[in-house]
Amino acid sequence: LGVFKSKGRLNKEPTSKYRSPFQRDRDRIIHSASFRRLKHKTQVFVNTEGDHFRTRITHSIEVAQIARSIAKYLNLNEDLTETLSLAHDLGHTPFGHAGEDALDECMESYGGFDHNLQTLRIIMFLENKYFKFKGLNLSIETLEGLLKHNGPVEDTNLVNKLIGLKTFKRKINFNTYPSLEAQISAISDDIAYNNHDIQDGINANLFKLEELMEIDFFKSIYLKYKKKINKKNYKIATYQIIRDSIDLMIRDLLANTQKNLKNLKIKSIKDI
């Protein structure tokens, strides 16, 4: 069910004897200027508020770690999954989604702004490091996974306006669901930020660990450690509860994924 063979790139290149197409994609992302710029962009907190709050770059690394673990268990392509995870936030603005909303309003007469499509603009046009082509010339599978981060493309007019449908050279079907690797990357994004935003919020004293009791999902986890929690080990308890939460979400995801694959009789990539 995994993607282990590439359809190639929009611009032909010699293959590598030492790295798969998806390893090369990952390496190009890591060495890009846009990836380095993520270190100053934050999820929730302003970058200057503290060294320990997460930035887009630390978030992307955490997403990649979660996604690789899931992909490995399901016998999918870990390199493609990691590539999509590392690249998924390249198009984000500073100041989180508020920054995106402000820029979208400013760019309304030019088609608006969408961070997922901006990610594609960056890797396809704005990162210029090669004589023969613009962008990073990533594999078709990586482009498709990023384009369909939220599922099949519903607004092809917006894609055409901001990127150009002809750019994809008819190598991507906009109406189908993305690969399992892309779906894992997307849900790993949710797992990472839902847990880590809570951890950052507690560390910033915006709310207390005890308040998680109001959320049914966290209540059972909190009660496991309630008797052990005190002022001295409060931070350790926070780490433990967040760690258990991530583990529970991953185990639930794996169980339901295997159940769905069986019930829906998914036998090949085409079935996805």
State each model region's role.
Residues 1-60, 64-70, 113-117, 122-272:
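Histidine-centered, transition-metal-coordinating active-site segments
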Residues 14, 68-80, 109:
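Short pre-active-site segment immediately N-terminal to the catalytic Zn-binding motif
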Residues 30, 75, 91-94, 110-111, ...:
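Short coil/turn residues that cap or connect secondary-structure elements
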Residues 74, 78-100, 119, 189:
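His-Asp-centered metal-binding catalytic motifs of divalent-metal-dependent phosphohydrolases/nucleases
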Residues 79-83, 94-111, 202-210:
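Post-HEXXH active-site segment of zinc metalloproteases
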